[in-house]
Curated annotation (Swiss-Prot):
This is Protein PsbN. The chain crosses the membrane at residues 4-24. It is a single-pass membrane protein. Its main location: plastid. Keywords: Chloroplast, Membrane, Plastid, Thylakoid, Transmembrane, Transmembrane helix. GO terms for cellular component: chloroplast thylakoid membrane.
Length: 43
């Protein structure tokens, strides 16, 4: 396999993994522990 193909596949997998982790953190189980600054600072 050529080096450019390997690098492209590696970067694509890395980007997809990061996006999946970000979505899991935002909407999955850990989202219950996130604070909402708008609810904390009501005027």
């Amino acid at each position: 396999m050529e080096t450019a193909t390997f690098v492209a596949i590696f970067i694509s997998c890395l980007l997809i993994s990061f996006t999946g982790y970000a979505l899991y953190t935002a909407f999955g189980q850990p989202s219950n522990e996130l604070r909402d600054p708008f609810e904390e600072h009501e005027d």
